[in-house]
Amino acid sequence: MPTSTWNRHHVLSLADFTAAEYDIVLKTAASFQEVLSRRTKKVPALQGQVVANLFFEPSTRTRSSFELAAKRLSADTLNFAASTSSMTKGETILDTAKTYLAMGTDIMVIRHKEAGVPNAIAQEMDRLGVRVSVLNAGDGQHEHPSQGLLDLFTICSLVDPANPRLELLQGKKIAIVGDILHSRVARSNIWSLIASGAQVHLAAPPTLLPKLFAEYIFGEETAPPGQLFIHWQLEPALQDADFVMTLRLQKERMTAHLLPSLREYHQLFGITRAKLQLCQPNVKVLHPGPVNRGVEISSDLMDDPEFSLIQSQVTSGVAVRMALLYLIGSGKT
């Protein structure tokens, strides 16, 4: 598997990923996808290493797939729950991380409601001079790198199952619809899709997609080699789209009344079969989950395998997270 050109010790953001790094992840994930199709779905790649899942926020897909990915690589896993930890007694996040370090952890997978926590822990590990890698599993509204990579892998694998690679999305139109303001998934996907040369169209109500969002992300309105477009109506984003990604309304992060009602939101921005008629005939729909049925996407469309890639995203998640753990862990053996 391709590790010779992989030099990244931590995976904290996709903002500085190179095209070569994207392709290494895609190629490695494709190899592990084949492993997962076997009767015995396990390899000894990380045998003897310890992967600690430090989740300070609730999670189903991300936590479970990271745990399964580590076990498929034969690593030992530790699962942390803040509600039953010493943090309830006042222990700090950094002290918690150091506790897991003292137990011999090799890779820390970290999710937290506050942006920057994985970066802070990575910096502390580097300061201590230890060979512990940190993988960001979602931090506040900042980023969710593994989700961005698994979405990229899901799309590229559909275009060319035998050889998923970044260049396959050059010129493709991809719409991202929903609560972009609060979405770490949107930010990671924007970085990866822009890097591929895709045309990325964001669509949401103005309260969930500020006018200066592109400048906030890039410091300018567009970033080569792809292009970023902002729409406050759904139709321009869907017109001739090859892929549509719809995002959950993150009501837990909304500090103000940003929407009149969920019913009105669904009428204006919810994805339905009828609205997909604006897209390319073979359009596919993605959602990172969890899904609010009948809000971001109609229930019948979500369950329709002709259009929906939602279950494929979950499947891809294990292979992609195996790839990430393998790539950052292979230098430790």
UniProtKB/Swiss-Prot annotation:
Q: Which domain of life is it from?
A: Bacteria
The Enzyme Commission number assigned here is 2.1.3.2
Alphabetized GO MF terms: amino acid binding; aspartate carbamoyltransferase activity
Q: Which UniProt keywords apply?
A: Pyrimidine biosynthesis, Transferase
The answer to keyword Nucleotidyltransferase applying to this record is no
What residues bind carbamoyl phosphate, as annotated? 61-62, 111, 144, 147, 289-290
Q: Which SUPFAM superfamilies match?
A: Aspartate/ornithine carbamoyltransferase
Its cellular-component GO annotations read: cytosol
A single Gene Ontology biological process assigned to it is: 'de novo' pyrimidine nucleobase biosynthetic process
Q: In which pathway does it act?
A: Pyrimidine metabolism; UMP biosynthesis via de novo pathway; (S)-dihydroorotate from bicarbonate: step 2/3
Entry-linked Gene3D superfamilies: Aspartate/ornithine carbamoyltransferase
Kindly state which reaction or reactions the protein catalyses: carbamoyl phosphate + L-aspartate = N-carbamoyl-L-aspartate + phosphate + H(+)
Q: Which Pfam families match?
A: OTCace, OTCace_N
Transferase among keywords? yes
Which of this chain's residues are annotated to bind L-aspartate?
89, 184, 248
UniProt lists the family membership as follows: Belongs to the aspartate/ornithine carbamoyltransferase superfamily. ATCase family.
Q: Say what the protein does.
A: Catalyzes the condensation of carbamoyl phosphate and aspartate to form carbamoyl aspartate and inorganic phosphate, the committed step in the de novo pyrimidine nucleotide biosynthesis pathway.
Q: How does it assemble?
A: Heterododecamer (2C3:3R2) of six catalytic PyrB chains organized as two trimers (C3), and six regulatory PyrI chains organized as three dimers (R2).
What protein name does the entry list?
Aspartate carbamoyltransferase catalytic subunit
Q: What is the lineage of its organism?
A: Bacteria, Bacillati, Cyanobacteriota, Cyanophyceae, Nostocales
Q: Provide the gene name from the record.
A: pyrB
